[in-house]
Amino acid sequence: MITSSHNPKIQAVRQLLARRKDRRQNASFVVEGVRLCEEALGSGWQPMEVFYSENISARGRALVEEQQKRGVDVEEVLPSVLASLSDTETSPGLLAMIAERELPLPPELDFVLVADALRDPGNLGTILRSAAAAGVQAAFLAPGTVDAFSPKVLRAGMGAQFRLPLRTLSWEQIVAICKQPARPLALFLAEAGQGVPLWQADLRQSLALVVGGEAEGASAEGRAAADQLLSIPMPGQSESLNAAVAAGILLFEVVRQRLT
């Protein structure tokens, strides 16, 4: 049993939880809790190590035992040590270090999300969850966007990251993909108070939907790349919507148009 927070394995987990740089260098990230672990493993992501405490649920213990049978390195950890790694109020008693992988892009893209300078982890995770539900084929993370595999984004995404192909790209790369002659994607940018009302735009065509950050909106590069601006009419007195709420409305307007 690991009983010290200074244990090298615990220190490695702490670094992966805290720093994007370490996640990239080690090509791995950490998921916390039974549900997220089940989502990751059920979607084909490979665990490198699993850590648990005596506080684990029966469901979690079954997961741990299954990974032990598969030869995964499993470590029991003192509850207080494992809890020190969590930024939630109650530690679920289970962590897994997962090997990073890149899900393949479909050969023909028709519906893409671009997260542009989205810095709030909760917003990005919620948007990715909505995108996966709406049938988005891939999400491109433009410069200034928070890491999709940080702990808070993973929790808010509820497993979307394990099913939705993600790419961290420059705007030059995004435009190159969207403007391929064989199957170009129209770039629609959501901009508060500007552009055509979303239901007046033709969202049945192949498209990439750009969603900017809540505080400052899309980047200058995102605005320059956009083919058309979209707005969500707000007859009330609020000046703007939460970025995740706005993205959900836009994503499912695409779904509505394509299903009717």
Describe the role of every protein-language-model region.
Residues 33, 119-127, 241-246:
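Amphipathic alpha-helical repeat scaffolds
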Residues 96, 133-134, 148-161, 220-260:
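Structured adenosyl-cofactor binding patch, chiefly the S-adenosyl-L-methionine
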